[in-house]
Amino acid sequence: MSEAANPEYNPSGVGDCIDTNKLPWVSIPNISGLSIKPARASTESGIFSVILKLEAGSSLPSSIYLGGMDMLILSGQIEYDQDGTKSILNPGTWGFICANSKVNAFVANEDTEVLANFYSGVAFLKDDGSLASIFTALDVLSLAKETNITLVPNSLSACMEIEGEPYRGNGEPLAITATENAGKLVDEPVSESAIGSEVTHPHFVDTHEVPWLVLPGMEDVGLKILRVSEETGYISLIVRHNGVAAPHTHIGASDFLVLQGRLGVRAGPPEGYGPGIWFYEPAGARHDATQRVTDEDLIYTANLYGPIMFDSGPGTQIESVLSWKEYKGLAEEGGIKLVPSTRSDDSSLLAWAPLKASS
């Protein structure tokens, strides 16, 4: 992708992405060993997206998730013990916890970094099960403001306004940027992988074990479909994007983190965006040319919060619309066992009395 293809690129502006490698780790008050790189926080929906860092021996406390939460282990190792069984979550493990779940602590066996999207607040519990504190999008906004971090805008109009400027302090790169091939987190065959997880809980899946699928007419784009919600229409994927995406509009928003390769967009830098760049495409965002800019596989995570509409260019007829139905159908055809959005027999669901502080 050349400079001529990027006439709208403004290297000093704040748009729909943030380079998490240039952000500092911001400590979470009252939780030892836990810090975050904040990316987005919505005052409308309460959703917030962060990269968590747990120091070796520390933990994300036992919690009640007031909304859903999805997560991908980027580096390190987490131990999760619930219902008498233990899961060892290594890099490449993806999980989803539904709203109102009471979940035991996630313990870091070594320094661990996790991409996490919280769909609402999370209530941290004391050892006796009473309420210790509640962490919400407002806390993320407050921490970002205190640290002079400008978060990714939540709407198309906010992206167009491009207020603020990127963080100018000293950042700390993600651990995945030090690896030769971060795509191995999700792409290395199980038979060759030395980092496979021991997953015993239905909330999680080792993405190494999920095969790549393709949609008809999009053979250059591989998909590992992880979760499809019929209730919300949300879809969670790993994408291997080696072709040119047809012109499209995001009817619903989406977010993604580049793991490997470099992503080129028309209004982006000529060299593209590499590992550690986190994107949020607001509802209504349009792309007429999205592609990789090197010969390396372009691999990224993706959450789609609504359908994508494809056409041949501005003002042309709609050619297709991809919604949760198409992704679920593709998963069923491929024999994929999706991570469940909720389970009536899940002992972590509603396994608690109403939240209250200790007397």
Predicted features by range, described:
Residues 52, 74-76, 91, 113-117, ...:
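Short, well-ordered beta-strand segments in beta-rich or mixed alpha/beta enzyme
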Residues 96, 109-128, 279-281, 295-314:
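A short hydrophobic beta-strand segment most commonly corresponding to one strand
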Residues 70, 79-104, 108, 230, ...:
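Short acidic-glycine-tyrosine-enriched beta hairpin
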Residues 65, 74-75, 94, 100-101, ...:
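Aromatic/pi-system hotspot detector in well-structured domains
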